[in-house]
Amino acid sequence: MKMEAMYEQLGVSRAVYEYGEEVLASLRPRFDAIDQTAEYNQAKVLAAMQKNRVNAAHFAATTGYGYDDEGRDNLERVYADVFHTEAALVRPQITCGTHALTVALSANLLPGDELLSPVGAPYDTLEEVIGIRESKCSLKEYGVTYAQADLKPDGTFDYDAIRAAINERTKLITIQRSKGYATRPSFSVDQIGALIRFCKEIKPDVKVMVDNCYGEFVERMEPSDMGADMVVGSLIKNPGGGLAPIGGYICGTKECVERCAYRLSAPGLGQEVGANLGLMPAFYQGLFLSPTVVSGALKGAVFAANIYEKLGFACVPNATESRHDIIQAVTLGSREAMVAFCKGIQAAAPVDSYVTPEPWAMPGYDSDVIMAAGAFVQGSSIELSADGPIREPYAVYFQGGLTWYHAKLGILMSLQKLVEAGIVTL
């Protein structure tokens, strides 16, 4: 059976397949560069595992308190070496990226302190954590204030506004690397490094936390290489490699990570407790595979931008820009187009491919959200997925794909559904 016939069997018409192949022919140099980054990061992860003498004993399950859990403790040493930090907290008890960020913020901010975002509004779910939208147990309720310096219209840092916002109460600065549900560019590690240096020149004792979600292993360097006191993320995104079924990480200075451990468990207990529940093989192997998995997701994002920009849709990043996370935003312009796109992603899934995604009132968001994710791990965004809030400018956010070939199929299926809906003509 020819390749185009196999795609037709999966629901992709010959016209859509041929359009995709035409676009793909021009992307070989981009894909080669992505592979080189993956090779570098694979070596970095392997070196950390070899340095810490990972062996079969580290895969043993623990229960209860988890005292003397050498597999867990060694994994945290591996993460600290991968991210070039003094310490790391890597736990299945951290349920998601928002949870990891909440632990990091609440552990390192006290009543009377101020949190500053120099990159505009935070991701939707953090609005309630901070207290921008009212919620019980928010930082605001505990007496932590919040300040924000918006980006310039071109998406660059407003250094004058940032300088004016930093004051004697500014204790912690939070930088969101990825665009989230916005259409601004994601920030490169170099850009984040320049911002960190600027902030610390004004207030040397200020702590900087980087929300690293969706950005791990996209570049050769991480924000922790550029002076961040903490980098924070989710194991069901990039660093879990699609194998971790739950978890989050915080890598940073010994002081910051120690405080995070006390906040996650209890004062006096810290990192000494927290059973691994048999998840160590998935955590170690997922980290090992992560550079390769991320490279496939990046190829999918580049392919999507080139597919949709050619059809007249605005894409962030655009078809030729460099990549700093795995997310591809495509502004589709209507609710109907968003739904059609997500139906295509869902139809390409290995799990729940027969399900039709519809917008719904998702907890933590102030508008209906549509999500397509036929994933092995619920909510995993390193697996092929697409989502977005049903609001202007009706942008859908595509990410993931455990393999490049699956990402490719998902993008072609999204286009197929737009063609079938009469929204796109090839």
Model-identified regions with their sequence ranges:
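Conserved PLP-enzyme active-site core in the AAT-like
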Residues: 3-28, 35, 45-58, 66-69, ...
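Generic structural marker for isolated residues within well-ordered, non-membrane alpha-helices
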Residues: 76
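Short glycine-rich or small-residue beta-strand-to-loop segments that form or flank ligand, phosphate
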Residues: 58, 62-63, 89-92, 326-331
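Acidic, PIN/NYN-like endoribonuclease modules and their adjacent C-terminal/linker elements
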Residues: 38-42
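Conserved C-terminal alpha-helix-loop-beta "cap" of PLP-dependent enzymes
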Residues: 309-426
